């Protein structure tokens, strides 16, 4: 696992600084990710490899295409894991996806980029939590905001750190809520909860992710 630990780095670098392969505007650097991808692919295990980015906002067409090319050259399935940390550098969310599938989806949709941001415990997520508690019977609701609006166009393995106190953890339900149209739809997914309290699930859609422990029911 490359990258210096926060304890070993100089105090001038904030603990939540983006990784070295992320450019000034928060976009993944096409040149740097190309190098990272080639290195990862050459060290692939069982035909699989992964590149990490931390606190990136977007990954664009050029970066995705560079990853897809590196993967194709060695016939390796290459994933990108985009991690979001809190101010102390602790990972609170991650989005993992196949770089080639993402490159194809972005080209097909003409969107030019995938948005990688994930918000937890912000004004936005608190407003949506209040909205759902006002209109629905569900007592236990956790909300995460993905920067990606609408469909990703490919499967994303998401992990988010949410407080599941009082939730029935054996019966979690996931929904995508589109604030612009004020509509929600269920995300059909299996899920796991790891030792660090991250909830892992799959989604093909972004927007707000609503996690609850019963089917959403109107008051």
Model-identified regions with their sequence ranges:
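Surface-exposed loop/edge segments in extracytoplasmic proteins
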Residues: 181-189
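Short, exposed beta-strand/loop patches in secreted or surface proteins that constitute
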Residues: 20, 40-43, 134, 189-194
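Generic detector of short, aliphatic-rich beta-strand segments that form the cores of beta-sheets
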Residues: 1, 153-155, 208-212
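Ser/Thr/Gly/Pro-rich low-complexity, disordered linker/stalk segments of secreted
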Residues: 1-41, 51
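C-terminal beta-strand-rich structural cap/linker in extracellular carbohydrate-active enzymes
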Residues: 195-218
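Short beta-strand segments and strand-loop junctions that repeat across beta-rich extracellular domains
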Residues: 173-182, 208-210
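Proteolytic processing hotspots in large secreted/extracellular or virion-associated proteins
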Residues: 27-173, 178, 215
């Amino acid at each position: 696992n490359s990258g210096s630990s926060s304890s070993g780095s100089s105090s001038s670098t904030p603990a939540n600084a983006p990784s070295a392969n992320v450019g000034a505007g928060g976009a993944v650097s096409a040149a740097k990710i190309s190098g990272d991808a080639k290195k990862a692919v050459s060290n692939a295990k069982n035909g699989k490899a992964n590149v990490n980015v931390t606190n990136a906002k977007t990954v664009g067409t050029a970066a995705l295409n560079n990853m897809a090319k590196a993967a194709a050259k060695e016939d390796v399935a290459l994933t990108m894991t985009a991690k979001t940390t809190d101010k102390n550098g602790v990972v609170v969310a991650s989005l993992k996806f196949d770089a080639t599938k993402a490159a194809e989806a972005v080209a097909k949709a003409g969107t030019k980029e995938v948005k990688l941001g994930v918000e937890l415990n912000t004004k936005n997520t608190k407003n949506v939590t209040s909205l759902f508690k006002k209109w629905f019977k569900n007592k236990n609701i956790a909300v995460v905001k993905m920067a990606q609006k609408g469909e990703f166009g490919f499967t994303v393995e998401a992990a988010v750190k949410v407080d599941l106190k009082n939730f029935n953890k054996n019966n979690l339900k996931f929904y995508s809520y589109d604030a612009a149209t004020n509509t929600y739809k269920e995300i059909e997914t299996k899920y796991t909860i790891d030792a660090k309290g991250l909830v892992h699930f799959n989604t093909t859609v972004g927007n707000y992710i609503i996690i609850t422990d019963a089917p959403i029911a109107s008051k």
